A protein has these predicted regions:
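PRPP-associated nucleotide enzymes
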Residues: 1-175
C-alpha cells in the first residue's frame, strides 16, 4: 500500500469537493499522523490554516496510557485556529480501526463548540470497528494481521521540512 498514492486520492477528493461546494471547510487532523496529513492538505489546497486535535484526555484507555497520554498531549496539543461553532469540519486521521480514537476526537472537538457538520477522512481503514463509526472518504481499505499496527511515517524530501512524503510501516503490536 502506497501512502503517497493514498494521500493524492484524499487531495483529489477535497479539490473536487471544493469545486462543487461553496461552503468553506476547515481541516482538523488527529495528532500525530492525521495532523501531518491535514498540514500538507492545507498547504496543497492553499488553505489559510488547519487544526490539530489531541485525544489524549478523551480516550477510554486513558488510565492504561498514564504518563504516555500526558506526554502525547504536551507534544502536540489541540490547536483549532478557526471558529468551531457552525464550521464544516473535515476530521482527518491516518488509520481507522476500532473507532475509539475518532470518538475521542469528536468529544475534544465539541469541547470547542458545535460544528455545522463533521466528515471523517482517513488514509487507511482496517475495519474491526467497536463503535458505529464510518469514514466519509477512505484512501484504501486494508487488511493487517491483528498482531501488527500500521504506522504512518513522514520522510523529509529535498532537505526542506515543508517538503515531505508519507509511507506506511508495519510494526508488531506491543504486548
Amino acid at each position: 500500500m502506497d501512502a503517497e498514492l493514498l494521500y493524492q486520492k484524499l487531495l483529489a477528493h477535497l479539490r473536487a469537493r471544493a469545486a462543487k461546494q461553496s461552503e468553506p471547510i476547515a481541516l482538523a487532523g488527529l495528532a500525530i499522523g492525521g495532523a501531518w496529513i491535514a498540514e500538507r492538505l492545507a498547504r496543497d489546497l492553499k488553505l489559510p490554516h488547519y487544526g490539530v486535535i489531541n485525544v489524549a484526555f478523551h480516550r477510554d484507555d486513558y488510565a492504561e496510557k498514564g504518563l504516555a497520554a500526558i506526554r502525547s498531549a504536551e507534544s502536540m496539543a489541540t490547536h483549532l485556529p478557526f471558529e468551531v461553532a457552525g464550521a464544516h469540519i473535515v476530521l482527518i486521521d491516518d488509520v481507522l480501526l476500532t473507532g475509539t480514537t475518532v470518538r475521542a476526537a469528536l468529544n475534544e472537538l465539541f469541547d470547542f463548540g458545535r460544528p455545522a457538520s463533521v466528515e471523517l477522512m482517513v488514509l487507511a481503514d482496517r475495519g474491526k470497528r467497536e463503535l458505529p463509526i464510518t469514514a466519509d472518504f477512505v484512501g484504501e481499505h486494508v487488511t493487517v494481521a491483528d498482531h501488527q499496527i500500521l504506522v504512518l511515517e513522514k520522510t523529509i524530501r529535498d532537505g526542506s521540512d515543508s517538503q515531505y512524503a508519507f509511507q506506511f510501516v508495519l510494526e508488531e503490536r506491543a504486548a
